Amino acid sequence: MSHLVLTPGSLTLKQIREISRGKVTLELADSAIADINTSAGLVQQVLDEGRTVYGINTGFGLLANTKIAADDLQLLQRSIVLSHAAGTGQYMQDATVRLMMVLKINSLSRGFSGIRLEVINFLIALVNAEVYPCVPEKGSVGASGDLAPLSHMCLPLLAEGEMSYKGQLITAAEGLEIAGLKPLELAAKEGLALLNGTQASTALALEGLFNAEDLFAASSVIGAMSVEAAMGSRSPFDSRIHAARGQKGQIDSAAVFRHLLGDESEISLDHVNCEKVQDPYSLRCQPQVLGACLTQIRHAAEVLGTEANGVTDNPLVFQDTGDIISGGNFHAEPVAMAADNLAIAIAELGSIAERRIALLIDSNLSKLPPFLVENGGVNSGFMIAQVTAAALASENKTYAHPASVDSLPTSANQEDHVSMATFAARRLRDMSENTRGVLAVELLAAAQGLDFRRPLQPAVAVAKAKAELRELVTYYDKDRFFGPDIEAATDLLITASYNAYLPADILPSW
């Protein structure tokens, strides 16, 4: 478990990846406390002066012009959390909720939200106790923020809802007891500050980003294995080709392949003077395709890294002037578009991998035994494994349709354009699982092809990757129950061990 002293607005992608993938204890930097207290004091000043300000002493959405009496302000905060906790579907994973909470703490602590330190410390205590609110996956359109998911996340502050502790569902009251907390009475603006924001969609999109990075690394390593297994040429990775075009992602992807394949191997030397002039695109154009995916991954990383440190509730409190201004930072369009770009990249990584599988099992193209098995006919080898890969790749093509172009007005047309960011980000997990499955099949196929090339040896990095797999899955000498082999290869990919094969500074969060 890592310990993080949080200076609001300064989370790095590497820190966020660690929070997403492992447990963390949080401590708020002392430097943040003054701004938090000043911001909360400005909200109280509005009440003391009897002014009417949206989000502090008014209704919400279409009811924004309804002034709320001072005696009802605490009830208003409780009511908004309870009424907006209207999500549905399966609960998000604890890791996702943990990341949501840290992102919310990060945003609230910047001093623009008018929320008391006591409330922020409450959320920190829940994270540190590893007691996580139960948050349904569905119910947000990504504007006005992720209202339903964040409301569910905040129910335990009122001793409402369910929580998750060490894999077990418990009541909020039980969760608060474990964390040593008492329910809070929220003050003016605090309910809205808690449930308004993009932290649910951003957390999901960041998880998608990290999966996309892992898949890019795996695609590069396994793609290099396929080059060797198919006796492909190294010349398409020549740096001069990619410099002539000038696309940074492509240049870096080609460098990755040169790093993995080296200048030569026993396999490459064996076919220097073969009759084959050019390789199929799925081998030859890997830097162009994977490089384009890398560009999208890097762009999404920039957008999501900014969003993770941004303030996305409404209205915002500006300490230098005392102004409290309504805007629209809760609109998650940047997150939605970043997630859409990631979806395209994840789909393409799977699509080209499936084509490499098809190449390897086709003896006319690879010069390997049909379906990568001895005694074909009696044995079917990788025939249906490729069908599985095709099914997964095809499913992702449907998922890759951009979600951000869809919008459905809500709240009596007051919220008349929305981002659909939460779905845009949520589907990335399913898409990542699909592409991981395709790559698992390619990993098995490439290793099988390399075994058929023996005694010739591939590049050092390729041989290492094959050896890691062979510790889990043996050579396929005859037909056997194939499913467990795919699962074992998938489990290997989940470890993200291939990230370490890449040169430094390729992946934004690694």
Swiss-Prot record:
Biological or metabolic pathway of the protein: Amino-acid degradation; L-histidine degradation into L-glutamate; N-formimidoyl-L-glutamate from L-histidine: step 1/3
GO biological process: L-histidine catabolic process to glutamate and formamide; L-histidine catabolic process to glutamate and formate
Cited CDD domains: PAL-HAL (cd00332)
Cross-link entry 5-imidazolinone (Ala-Gly), positions: 143-145
UniProt GO molecular function: histidine ammonia-lyase activity
GO cellular component terms, A-Z: cytoplasm
PROSITE patterns with a match to the protein in the record: PAL_HISTIDASE
Modified positions (2,3-didehydroalanine (Ser)) in chain numbering: 144
Keyword entries, A-Z: Cytoplasm, Histidine metabolism, Lyase
EC number: 4.3.1.3
Entry's localization field: Cytoplasm
Catalysed reactions, as listed in the record: L-histidine = trans-urocanate + NH4(+)
Keyword Cytoplasm appears in the UniProt entry: yes
Domain of life: Bacteria
Family, per entry: Belongs to the PAL/histidase family.
HAMAP family attached to this UniProt entry: His_ammonia_lyase (MF_00229)
PANTHER family given in the database record: HISTIDINE AMMONIA-LYASE
Name of the protein described by the UniProt record: Histidine ammonia-lyase
Organism: Shewanella piezotolerans (strain WP3 / JCM 13877)
